[in-house]
A protein has these predicted regions:
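Ligand-binding pockets and gating/stacking loops
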Residues: 1-114
């Protein structure tokens, strides 16, 4: 989670773009165990970054994008994981003056196709 603090410090120092990596998201197996470990940490780290930037008056000037390069299968595979699924993906957007509390886009009922 230290890399989130470093990202904030880089923004304060005037960096125009900061990219960071958190965990390893290629969960082809043991999806539930890994998610129970990693997702709370990601939630705390992103929440702290948003709050930190807001408290410093920087949030409207910084766009935060939490995103992977493709989605995961809507169905669990035989090793309790999810495989690559380029048909649907998701991203979390914050800051940058964006309106909050919205969902953009939709999938079918099973999350298979947009």
């Amino acid at each position: 989670m230290e890399n989130f603090l470093i990202a904030r410090r880089l923004v304060e120092a005037g960096a125009r773009v900061v990219s960071l990596n958190f965990s390893r998201w290629d969960w082809h197996g043991d999806n539930f165990k890994i998610a129970r470990n990693d997702m709370p940490m990601l939630d705390r780290a992103v929440s702290a970054l948003v709050e930190d930037l807001s408290n410093r008056g920087l949030l409207n000037d910084v766009s935060i994008v939490v995103w992977g390069e493709f989605g995961r299968t809507p169905k669990i595979n035989n090793t309790a994981g999810r495989d690559h699924w380029p048909q649907v993906s998701c991203a979390l957007l914050a800051g940058g003056g964006m309106r909050t509390g919205q969902v953009i886009g939709a999938t079918n009922r099973l999350g298979e196709y947009a």
